[in-house]
Amino acid sequence: MLTWNVTYHCKPGQRADFYQALCSLGIRENSIHEEGNLKYDYFFAAEAPDDLLLVETWTEQALQDAHCSTEIFAQLQALKARYCDSVHIDKFNY
């Protein structure tokens, strides 16, 4: 099993718009129905107003890799380019 903590460092003042765009595209709804996905949840950082945290858990790496090749993932990349300054990923395998 693997969990990724993905911190999106949004452009100043863009976190709410980024999150709304993610919701409008159905990123989470699509992802939670993919094979091997156990968790795909967003969290707002209380002390970092421009950060959005995604915690995603997968049963195996191959299925997470498949997620990264979906059309919805490609659309996510376009949103990141528009709304985010950078992204940091912490990966945990267990």
Model-derived segments and spans:
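Short, flexible helix/strand-to-coil boundary loops that buttress conserved ligand/catalytic motifs
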Residues: L22, H67-C68, Q77-K80
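Glycine-rich beta-strand-turn "strand-cap" elements at beta-sheet edges
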Residues: L38-D50, Q75-Y94
